[in-house]
Amino acid sequence: MIKVAWAKYEPDNKDNVESCITLNGDGELADRPCEVTRPYICYRPESLKIEVTECGTIDPEYHLDKRTNKCYKLHTVPRNFSRAYLACSAEGGHLAIINNDVEATVLRELFAKYPDAKFLGNYRKDLAFIGFHDWGEKWDWRTVHGQTLLEAGYTSFAAGEPNNWTPGESCGGIFRTGLLIDVWCDKPAAFFCE
């Protein structure tokens, strides 16, 4: 347990909007609005045993697939594309990039292990974000590493896709079938990290 004291006049819940706690430069606590992005400190008891998985992470939700020799995680809590990208980066990876039919099969099989009931929220559960998007040039689909889909090795879109339906579908996704789709970047979806 870390011993700390509240700063003078804290907590005060000023304007009834201060629901988060911060640590000031003097090592004292204060309540602040949660909407403000701030640096943070993680705490772990010394007694907590942490094991690194075969994926080189402490996150047990990453699984190594021997066919591709890559690790994958399907996030079931939805995020928009940019937040999904950040989540994968924070975990030391990136949004999954499909390099061949085998990798599409791997993601399809992983997706199948998660029925709709395992996904939280009101959003489409038949697709997930992966690491490609339209780089501002219509129909110029590129991975988050800048490769064209052809260079990456997989271009199998579902029938009628990409269609940029009601302009704005500029981000990449995968159906449960393993086929690609263009989706709205700002609408939350499940996502694959690699």
What function would you assign to each model-found segment?
Residues 11, 25-26, 45-49, 101-103, ...:
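Acidic glycine-/aspartate-rich tracts in secreted/extracellular proteins
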